[in-house]
């Protein structure tokens, strides 16, 4: 879970006028509760000047003040926090000059990493946390960071890839159309992720990739600069797709807060996939699909028990009532095993009839819809 500890009740504010730091007991309790439930925590090391919302990075004195606070936080939470992320969306530029050019952020990272390593050698250090990567200026900043000398020094790279992203045919996914951005963002997103990993690896990075803050807002959760025309059901379907896409690309998946009382279907999909996909790793195996459906997407996984998982869906605009379409799925090389279908939107699970053909399994008349159906192939 990704958290920001905020003892003053206002996001990202620290009172620099004091000569000591303290953690609010309520925040302490939240951290302890998460730890007791074996939840891995990422703590965002992000602070702003409360008067101007300006990031402290401009002078060496500013940086040293920040590092003093970082040292306190890491020392205080040593053994309880698994990841530390250096700032959130550091490239943001408010009315005051708070945005950080890449060289300034790189300089801050180079000085912050040794402090974290000294205080907690087991902790992982994450950089990036760049905002919506559909926008050209965000990706330009991101490429600058990925091509910098800090990539071999850190353990994680993060970005905010999906704020209401949707297939091009779904107008609800449009965001700030006057801002230069990638065409057909949803369709091109997997290629973007692959390019992120390629560039990072080429620059010496050997760590973990993390997508954060994914969300599909409804009209009950509006935001003036983000898409919010989705329904609970259509949003749930996009949550399901996005989780599978990122897991299939070997990216750790992070979501914004989804409240169960407001978004019951979305919450159900997230909860269901968290259970079904626990321990799953991408592992390609042969799959054949015959259907009148267009744009069928699928990803393959294995779990520690040895079972294989196939996630399959149609990748058009998500609707509340998708009538489904039949498909014939072949699994060459899998000559035995029990197939179970798992519908995380409806919370249903049932055995799927299959037969043998040409040394593999074949499933006829499988109904696929616009959200992931999980087929689990158990060992014989």
Where are these regions (language model features)?
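Solvent-exposed beta-hairpin/edge-strand motifs
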Residues: 330-348
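Conserved hydrophobic residues forming the short capping helix/wall of the S-adenosyl-L-methionine
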Residues: 116, 197-200, 274
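Aromatic/acidic polysaccharide-binding cleft in carbohydrate-active enzymes
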Residues: 211-296, 304
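Glycoside hydrolase catalytic-domain groove-lining segments
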Residues: 21-24, 162-224, 240-254
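Substrate-binding cleft and catalytic face of glycoside hydrolase catalytic domains
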Residues: 1-174
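Carbohydrate-binding surface patches
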Residues: 290-335, 373, 378
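Well-ordered, non-membrane alpha-helical segments in soluble/globular domains
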Residues: 20-28, 66-67, 105-111, 138-144, ...
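C-terminal beta-strand-rich structural cap/linker in extracellular carbohydrate-active enzymes
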Residues: 353-380
């Amino acid at each position: 879970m990704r958290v920001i500890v905020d003892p003053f009740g206002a996001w990202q504010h620290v009172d620099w006028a004091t000569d000591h730091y303290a953690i609010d007991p309520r925040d302490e309790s939240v951290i302890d509760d998460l730890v007791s439930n074996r939840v891995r925590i990422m703590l965002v090391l992000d602070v702003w000047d409360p008067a101007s919302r300006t990031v402290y990075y401009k002078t060496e004195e500013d940086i040293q003040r920040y590092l003093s606070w970082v040292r306190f936080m890491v020392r205080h939470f040593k053994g309880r926090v698994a990841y530390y992320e250096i700032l959130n969306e550091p490239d943001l530029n408010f009315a005051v000059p708070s945005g950080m050019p890449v060289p300034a952020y790189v300089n801050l990272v180079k000085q912050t990493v040794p402090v974290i390593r000294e205080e907690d050698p087991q902790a992982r250090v994450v950089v990036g946390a760049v905002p919506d990567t559909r926008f050209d200026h965000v990706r330009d900043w991101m490429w600058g960071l990925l091509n910098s000398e800090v990539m071999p020094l850190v353990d994680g790279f993060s970005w905010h890839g999906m704020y209401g992203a949707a297939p091009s045919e779904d107008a609800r996914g449009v965001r700030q159309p006057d801002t230069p951005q990638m065409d057909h963002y949803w369709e091109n997103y997997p290629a973007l992720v692959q390019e992120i990993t390629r560039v990072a690896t080429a620059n010496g990075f050997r760590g973990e990739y993390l997508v954060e803050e994914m969300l599909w807002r409804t009209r009950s959760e509006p935001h003036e600069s983000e898409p919010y025309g989705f329904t609970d059901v259509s949003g749930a379907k996009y949550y399901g797709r996005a989780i599978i896409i990122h897991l299939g690309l070997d990216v750790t998946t992070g979501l914004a807060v989804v409240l169960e009382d407001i978004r019951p279907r979305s919450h159900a999909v997230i909860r269901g996939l968290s259970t079904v996909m626990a321990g799953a790793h991408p592992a390609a195996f042969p799959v054949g699909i015959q259907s009148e459906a267009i744009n069928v997407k699928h990803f393959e996984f294995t779990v520690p028990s040895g079972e294989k998982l196939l996630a399959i869906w149609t990748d058009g605009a998500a609707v509340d009532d998708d009538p489904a379409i039949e498909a014939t799925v072949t699994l060459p090389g899998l000559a035995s095993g029990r197939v179970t279908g798992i519908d995380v939107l409806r919370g249903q699970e049932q055995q799927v009839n299959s037969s043998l053909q040409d040394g593999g399994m074949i499933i006829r008349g499988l109904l696929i819809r616009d959200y992931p159906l999980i087929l689990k192939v158990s060992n014989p």
